[in-house]
Each structure stands twice: as structure tokens, then as C-alpha cells.
Amino acid sequence: MLEIFDKLGYKKQKCKTCGHEFYAQVDRDTCGDAPCDEYEFIGNPATDKPYTLYEIQQVFREFLEKEGHTPIKRYPILAKRWRDDVFLVGASIFCFQPWVTSGMVKPPANPLEIEQPSVRLNDVDNVGRTGRHMTCFTMGSHTVINTEENFIYWEDETIRLCHEFFKYIGINTEEICFIKSWWSGGGNEGPCYEVCVRGVELATLVFIQYKTLDNGEKEEIPIKVVDTGYGLERIAWISQGTPTAYDACFAPVVDKLKELTDVKVNTDILARNAQIAGMMDIEDIGDIKELRQQVANSLGITLDELLESAEPMEAIYIIADHTRCLAFMLADGIIPSNVKEGYLARLVLRRTIRFMKELNMKESLAEVMGIQLEFLTKFYPEIKDSEDHIMNIISLEEERYQSTIKKGTSIVKRSIKRLKKEGKTEMPLDMLMDLYDAHGIPPETVVEIAGDNFTVNVPDNFFTLVAGAHEKDTSNKKESFEIDYPETDLLFYKDFNQKEFEAEVLGVVEKDGKNTLVFDKTVFYPEGGGQPSDVGTISVDGAVVNINYAEKVNNVVLHHVDGDVDLDNFVGKKVEGKIDWNRRITLARHHSATHLIVAAARKILGEHIWQAGAQKGVSRSRIDLSHYKRISQEELNEIEKLANEYVMDNIELDIKFYTRDEAESLYGFKLYQGGIVPGKSIRVVKIPGIDVQACAGTHVLRTGDIGPIKINKTERVQDGVERIDFSAGTAAVDSIQNENKLLRESSGIFKVDDDQLPKTCDRFFSEWKAQKNEIDKLKSEIASLKMNSLADDVTEINGLKVVKQLIDADFKELQKIATDFTDNDKADVVLMGNNDGKIVGAASQNAIDAGIKVNEIIKKAAGVLGGGGGGRLTLAQGAGPKCENMNEALNIAIDLI
């Protein structure tokens, strides 16, 4: 037992319900946490006075500042700004992992205090139902980084501060329980105490001592971290005694939503429901209906009475919570999409629309978001700065959602049809999740489309399962490669213009089945940051060897040699190296141009622009930018123009090495536009007044050295990501000349001047379109005539009217004639072919009911033609190169009826 517990009068006890060890000042049978204890503060606040969320944030900050902690500003909730293993900040400690907790970087203050908005979607299905779960919550923390040289405080002082804070806000300390437990998250773990009062956990005090390894094992770390997490929303809630935390923390939003939806509230049922339902999570019960029934039984009312009161309010709570979460997500730079953090934002957004639909709200999501922003921006001015951006995304995403639902009907119907064909009567969960994952079709829409014809069971924790599959980033996992050589001296950082060098060969390293050379120093830039490596030659004892690739492994540059060369003879010798300078300067121009284009795009499109990837090339390069819609040609022109203005300003680049904490302190997380840069020291490329990034690539000395920048095209590479293809320097001149050449050649074909080309092309297209329509009309008339001429060729086979004919018609005509026969009841089965090896089959509903599978018939008939075929039960087509076998193919088709 810790000395501090004894000093403060806490006694070690064991919960008679759950068996957990806990500490309290008075004798108790239970540990103070749900489900062992009900919420005992609803209608009976636990503090001397009520606090709003923002008041409790201020009190928390002031209390810890008096106790010697330095308050710091919140971090973005998008953790990918500084780490590559998770997408979102799930706890305040995520802000300091891995760089601070590993000792590589100094903390911004020590000890520090922060109120950090955090997002957790692993229990999203509990939101609105338990009264306490939120997708986005504010974690108050006092954090300490203890080292051997500077050990500040550990368990005793952490517990004392917690005890004193709750006492300070008016909680009776005899109601506080410290439950002994274990915590892990973000790659670290350690023992902890969960601090509970009147049935709700208010804080977790974690003492991080271990790193969590990939294999699940733990490894002790030299730095000991005090990581506390106070649920500030819950503390505000317990101080007010409202039925739910939502009523306590965003009452103005909840009240406005109640007004818009005209939801009537039975406060007695709602309060008692919150007390009981709060003790149970969906994952604990497994079935929401069972949970509802238990609550209804406890209240002495019917299930219908409970649902009538609870469900509309739960939907309102969910909408209020989700719009708050979205405000932080979008303001901090997340672009909704179908991948990574964008997927999580879209999940929250579409759940919001779903519950608005349940309440039959006439308002748009943008209007509802406006209500949330009016409340939230009073306390977070940085969100106010992003208000227009947020509203643009919300409006666009709402349109996309409606489009998805329309398209979803046919996708779901096809999926159900396939399952029925396989003899299944219920949709598997993995298919239901895939319909949401791949197509954005929510489960309730699938249920609605399936109707009574097919069983679709949606688990109550569906969205929790979906979110859980997307919360961690596994795309950056790399295989480890051990190498035991001293760090290579990178000469290109000391003198960009150095083209030749002399070095000593330290050894030969085999990697990926190839032998590579290690030097003590090099001018060869190794591939990295989307920039290809330098190439060139080395001379050893008069022999010249080509270097076709260089890569860096653990700060050692490996030089790949072209051809089959005995490298062991080189070890210990001096070599003279020379790089391909034209390639180097071209790549450097493209790399510097990349920075200018990103800066220009941010200026033109908005501060949300973030580099999502890049690849530099010799003739053209590309950069991927996170953006919520297509970049228009007008915007592209503006970006290109601004980037070239930066070039003409001929600004000198400022390139320096900083410690990570110095760089972040000076420039923030926008440093990491090009990705997370590992290491304690980082190289910062600054174009004064325009852009600053952590970047290891080669760059020109002044922007004027880049030369012209030509944007070639843009494309949508994935949802939420726009790719800009561009060229710089002489490569840009080549691109411009090539476009001019194509323009002149096109003008020559039409025999018009260049400026007349668009008008001429438009006229030719209009004429072609009109002629095509006329041709299609004539083909339709011909098909009608041919159909009439074939009316007498109907024969009867097994009670079905059948037409078989080899005629002179193209594929589309064959299809039209065949379907016209079956649609107008002139025939049940139509089999037609032409002399080009095309075969078509059509079947009426009467034929299908009789067991005719025209798609299988055509597939077999097309085999005779040396090809294949298939299609639907109503219409199938096939083709093959053996045109001379068409009569045989049609006869085989007839035999299969």
C-alpha cells in the first residue's frame, strides 16, 4: 500500500461484486464504479456548486498551475500530424508519443497541464444510450516526464493532486474510490488507478513504465511517465446532476434540437433510465433489446413506454455529440473519405444523418452543424476560423450521402440475389460491413431494401466493429533490417553543388539478394521522401563501376552497383565517386517546386490542404493533396500562377538542422507536410514567407533556380485526395513545347488556326452526334422491320415459343430485336447470331419460370465459336472468332431448350 493512501486515510478494500482491489476512506462493499454502483448523482450533484464544461476546464487549469504545472495549448486531434501508427488522438498522452515518452524530444513543459480533445470510436454504439459515452471528449491531464537526472514526482504526488483537486471542487473525499488496474494505449502501458465517485469513473492515473512491443510483450523503458486523464465532461456532469453528460456539457445544442424536433421529454423516465442504463454497455449485454427490457422492468413500465421516451432523446444526444466531434475533426484538417482518418470522419458524419432521419428532421446537416458551431466556437476560436471550410465539407458530404443511398439500392439487390442463388437466407456480417466499407451503404438501408424477402440482422455494436477495424494505421509497418556500420557522412547537405567526392569503402552489405557498398561519406542522395536517389559512377583502382541506386538504412547509405561485380575486393580501398549532375539538379528543381505548389494550393484552396504523398521524377512529378472536392481548372490556373510568382521572387531557401522540440516549437506540426521525419534532429527547409517543412531532400538554393513550373493535369486518385502532375525547369519547357506541338498537329488536321480549334472541334462533335442519332434511329427502324419479317419464324419447343435466326445485324441490333420479341410476348426464347461471330439470347418471364437459363445456353453456344459468353436470365450475349460455326452454335442452343 502506498504511503500516500495511509496518510490521506484511504484503506485497502476488495469489491464484493467485481472483486477488484480499491482504496477508500470509508468501509464499502463496492468499488464505486458501474455496474457495481448505480449513478448516485443524478438529481443529487456531488459538488458544492455546478460547473459547466468550460468552467471546470478553467478550474482544472488554475488548480494545477498553482501546483507548479505549466498549461499548454491543445494539440490537433489528427495524430497523424506527428506520428504514423494511429490516426486520431485517443488520449492526452498520444500528443507526446513516441518522441517525448521515448526521451528523444523534450516535453513542451515539465510538469505540464493540458485539456486535450480526444476521439474514441471503439464504443460509438454506446453514445447517447449510457449517458456518459462520447465520441469526442476533453481529457484534462497533468503529465510528468521523469528521467534519472530529473525525477519530478511519481505515484504518491499524483494521488495527492487528484485527491486535492476533487476536494477543491467540493467532492466529499469519503466518496472517492481509487481502483487498482492496468492501462495500455498508443504503444505504452503501466499500472494505473481508476478514480470513481458515485458510480462513474472521473479520472485514470497511469504510471507508464513499459513499451508495448509488436508481439504483445512489454519492455521496460528508462523514462517513467505520469499520464493522468480526467474526464472533464463527466466532472461537469457530476457537478450538475443532470440525467446525462450531454445535458450538462452541450445543453444549448440539445435544447435547440429538442425545439426543432418537437421531442417531448418525460424527465422522470429519462433520469431513471440514465441511472440504470448507464450501468450497462452494449458490449456487456450483447443485445440492445435485452438491455432495454431490463431497464423497462427496473422502471416498472412497458418496453414501448421506455422506447417512446428514451429513443428520440438518445438520437438528439447522438446528433449533438457527433456534430461536436465532426467540428473538431474537420477544423483540425481531416477530409472525409473512404480510407484512414477520412473514413472515421465519414462514419461519424453519416451516423449523424441517420439519426436526423430517424427524427424526421427537415433541416440539413449543415443547418444542424451551424447550431453546434454557434455554441462551440465561443470556447474554441480556432474552430471559428475554419467555419466556412467545415460548412462546405458538410454540405458536399450530405449530397454525396444522398447519391450513395440512391446507387446503393441496386448494389444491395445484386448482393441479396447472389446470396439467394448460393442458397443462403441471411446476409453474413462481413458482407453487411463490406457494403458499408466499400460502398457507404448504412445497415438500416440494407434492411429497408431487403424488406421481408431476406433476413438482415444488424448487431447493436455494428459501428463499433466498423470503427475498430479502421482506427489504427498499419500501412507504415516496415520490415526491420539490422546493419552494423557507422553513420554515413552526407556531403550533399554540406555543399549542394558538390558533384564529386573521395571516400573509403567500409564494407559490403547484402540486401534483397544484392550486394551493396558502404562508404564513410557520400554525395549520392539516397531515395527518400518521394525523391529518387542519385545515380553515377565510382572509380576503384582505375576501374569504373556504375551506381544505379542508393538507399539509407539506419543512417547508413547503401550504394547499389550495376552488373555482376566482385565487391569484396573494394573493401578498405579509396574510391572516387561522381553523380549524374543533370539528374540531381532536375530532381532538386522538382522537389523545391513541390513545396511551392503545396504552399500555393494552401493559399488558394484553404488551410486544410495537406500533402498526402509525392513522387519526384526527371520529366514530371506529382503531389497528392487532401481536398474534399475536385480542383477546378480555374483554381489550378491560380495555383500554377502563384507558384511561378514565388519562383520569380527568387527567394533564398533557409535550410537548417534543429532538434525536434526546437523545430516544433518554432513551426508547429505543419513541418510534417511531407510525412513524419524520424530522429531527434530534423532538417527544416524554409522558404521565408511561403512554406516551411521538415525535409531531407535536395533543393535548389533560391526559388529562381527552379525555373518555370507547368501543371500538366490533375486527377482524383482516391476519395479526398487530388493529384497534381507537374514539371519544373527544362522539363516544364519540354511539356509546354509538347502541348504546343499537339495543338499545331490538331489544328493542321482540321485546317484551322489554333484559336479556332475549340470552336471547330465543338462543331464537328455536334455534327457527329446528330449523325449518330440519325444512324441509331435508322438502325431501330431496320430492327423493327427485321423483327416483323421474323414473326412467321416462331416455332414451338416444349410449350415455349422460340425464334432462331442468323441475320445481318450488329450486336446492338441483335439485342434490340431479341428483347423486343420477348418484351412484347411475341416469343419466349430468341436465339440470334450474325456473320461476325456475335450471338445473343433473350428469354421472357414465362421461359425463366419454365427453367430456361439463357445465360448458360449462350455461354455453351459461344464455346463452339471459340469464345465465351454470359449475362442475365433475361438477356445474354457471347462472341467468338470462329464465325463459320454460327449455325452449329445456334443449333446447340436450340438443343439446350
UniProtKB/Swiss-Prot annotation:
Zn(2+) binds at residues 591, 595, 695, 699. Its cofactor is Zn(2+). Keywords: Aminoacyl-tRNA synthetase, ATP-binding, Cytoplasm, Ligase, Metal-binding, Nucleotide-binding, Protein biosynthesis, RNA-binding, tRNA-binding, Zinc. GO terms for biological process: alanyl-tRNA aminoacylation. It holds the Pfam family tRNA-synt_2c. GO terms for cellular component: cytoplasm. GO terms for molecular function: alanine-tRNA ligase activity; aminoacyl-tRNA deacylase activity; ATP binding; tRNA binding; zinc ion binding. It is found in: Cytoplasm. The keyword Aminoacyl-tRNA synthetase applies. SUPFAM superfamilies: Class II aaRS and biotin synthetases (SSF55681), Putative anticodon-binding domain of alanyl-tRNA synthetase (AlaRS) (SSF101353), ThrRS/AlaRS common domain (SSF55186), Translation proteins (SSF50447). Belongs to the class-II aminoacyl-tRNA synthetase family. Consists of three domains; the N-terminal catalytic domain, the editing domain and the C-terminal C-Ala domain. The editing domain removes incorrectly charged amino acids, while the C-Ala domain, along with tRNA(Ala), serves as a bridge to cooperatively bring together the editing and aminoacylation centers thus stimulating deacylation of misacylated tRNAs. PANTHER family: ALANINE--TRNA LIGASE, CYTOPLASMIC, ALANYL-TRNA SYNTHETASE. This is Alanine--tRNA ligase. The gene is alaS.
